[in-house]
Amino acid sequence: KDVDCLNPLNAGELYLGRSRWAPCTPRACMATLSHYGIELKGKHVVVLGRSNVVGKPVALLLLQEHATVTICHSRTQDLPGVLRQADIIVAAVGIPSFVKPDMVKDGVVIVDVGINAVDGKLFGDVDAAVAEKASAFTPVPGGIGVVSNMMVMDMLSRDL
């Protein structure tokens, strides 16, 4: 089973909005936002990361929900300025504590997908201090990773 939609046919179906499923971690992001009643329609969502496993697929899923999506990465010019415009940030850049409090506006929703091991401890891509400014914040560990694991189990149990 292709739980991360890496097969070119499945990736193409996802791109065209016709896929019966999506990669597990992007699905986990969407399920978490839905569970907590986070409105996406018309919201400016910045996806920080452009991987084929998280960044691009989650951007496609957000577009299907009528969000306005900007995809950024560690080399985006004036990244703090772009992030400060976001209503929602999905961080999947793979750099520990990369997003700092001065890079986001008050009330932002943070979905931290990053999982980075530093000296035996796990850190997300968003500095934990950002939680004080956020209206919603997924922690690392204990956030999207847990939901992503549930999505893997869901995919493996399906008769596709």
How does the language model describe each region?
Residues 1-14, 111-160:
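Rossmann-fold NAD(P)-binding glycine/threonine-rich loop
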Residues 19-105, 109, 121-123, 127-128, ...:
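Glycine-rich phosphate/diphosphate-binding loop of Rossmann-like nucleotide-binding domains
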